[in-house]
Amino acid sequence: VKSLVGRVRAGLRELFALPEGYEVLLGNGGTTAFWDAATAGIVRERGLHLSYGEFSSKFASATKKAPFLADPIVVEAPAGDAPDPLTSGQTGADVITWAHNETSTGVMVPVARPAGLDDGTLVLIDATSGAGGLPVQIADADVYYFAPQKGFASDGGLWLALASPAALERIAQVDADRPTVGATRWIPEFLSLTTALDNSTKDQTYNTPAVATLFMLADQIEWMLANGGLDGMVARTTASSSHLYGWAQAGAVTTPYVSDPAKRSLVVGTIDFDDSVDAGAIAATLRANGIVDTEPYRKLGRNQLRVAMFPATDPSDVQALTACIDYILEQNA
């Protein structure tokens, strides 16, 4: 296990060209566990959260429920859009958070450190479905966290975080001081980022992880490095997404759901269909023929398909998918 964790940490350090002083942390539980860990161990008093979909709203929900934190500041945008983090640097928060890619809607938001942040405000980026397939300069984030089951073609149940020196200092301070604006702050050992850091630097985890998950993750990272690194992966997702959105714009009954081209994700594409076409029936036909998981996010409730375009997906597969959809449309015309 230590050898596998070491391969993962070394590979991520190279893939993301980590600046001096950054550390790779990991632990069990996936991104959901990390939201709770960050709530308990990084946010001192109040968080500022950009909320624009099912998953970007969950961190805000976690900090709102914490009895030892002040209510978060939440900047919202409707589904299919996103707030601009560069203009959202309100005062009064010691962390600002947003999702690099909102998985439910296919909206991506670049990682850039907002100007005018209060001194000591940390930038936390949820890259659960964006890491490995979207461009990023890690120095623009204090914590860039994700899980293996999207861009890294592994299984879930594990979280990984690339943490800056400022974030590491905050973790130590919160653990030592236990700041509170209400009830006493309790940090369960399972959610302790101090414990996660201590174990990660020894190439291990606090709880034994699934070895298969680590093996697939390490192997995928090394494949990424052998095929052009992060730039090579972004080239693949760009090719896939350019084809998908170009196809949708050219179609008579299809439209990219995200109206702003700059916010259309390179890794999760959402395509709306005209009311004359039942997108659910198309997804069912695809599934019956072995092409699975093109259904939209269930809570969005739109007549659309959602297409994964992570680095492991060959761009030619996206081209084949749109050809299959065209065939279904022709047969039902």
Per-region residue spans from a language model:
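PLP-dependent enzyme catalytic core of the Aspartate aminotransferase-like
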Residues: 299, 303-333
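Conserved PLP-binding catalytic core of the aspartate aminotransferase-like
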Residues: 255-285
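Active-site phosphate-binding strand-loop segment of PLP-dependent enzymes
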Residues: 77-132, 143, 151
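Conserved N-terminal alpha-helix of the aminotransferase class I/II PLP-enzyme fold
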Residues: 1-37, 61-62
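Active-site C-terminal subdomain of aminotransferase-like
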Residues: 152-238, 242-245
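Conserved active-site segment immediately N-terminal to the catalytic lysine
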Residues: 138-149, 159
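PLP-dependent aminotransferase-like
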Residues: 33-94
